[in-house]
Amino acid sequence: MAKNRVEKITERLVMPIIQNENFELVDLEYKKEGSNWYLRIYIDKPGGITLDDCQKVSEQLGEELDREDPISENYFLEVSSPGLDRPLKKDSDFIRFAGEIVEVKLYEALNGNKVIEGELVGLEENMIKINVANVGLLELPKEKVALTRLAVKF
């Protein structure tokens, strides 16, 4: 089954479950790693997701997937938090996490760099704005960005 079709069906099935629990769907992916397929659902809520939250969504979604049976391959279902390095996907993410340090991966290098780290200023007219040390404010067209995620600092 086509990856996009599985993801669309899964999103349709999981949305009522997470909305009922007042959770946010951060991301979902259906991908093959080695010889195994994985259906991964990343959820969040204010204050953070717990293991019990993940289990509840996993059980309910598992029942829906078993009932509709949209995936022909054997797969592993994983429900988890997005982690400390959560991806920023929705426009609202860029507003919510303004002021945080982010890592931006570009499709093509900019001044020799495909990865840029800086303070997220926000998103305006499809331009991701980040303040980069020793460079200043950069405005990056969203379509040229492969991935934006929160940077993890230790």
Curated annotation (Swiss-Prot):
It is found in: Cytoplasm. The keyword Cytoplasm applies. Gene3D superfamilies: Ribosome maturation factor RimP, C-terminal domain (2.30.30.180), RimP-like superfamily, N-terminal (3.30.300.70). One of its GO terms (biological process) is translation. SUPFAM superfamilies: YhbC-like, C-terminal domain, YhbC-like, N-terminal domain. Keywords: Cytoplasm, Ribosome biogenesis. Pfam families: DUF150_C (PF17384), RimP_N (PF02576). Its main location: cytoplasm. GO terms for cellular component: cytosol. Belongs to the RimP family. HAMAP family: RimP. Required for maturation of 30S ribosomal subunits. This is Ribosome maturation factor RimP. It comes from Alkaliphilus oremlandii (strain OhILAs) (Clostridium oremlandii (strain OhILAs)). The gene is rimP.
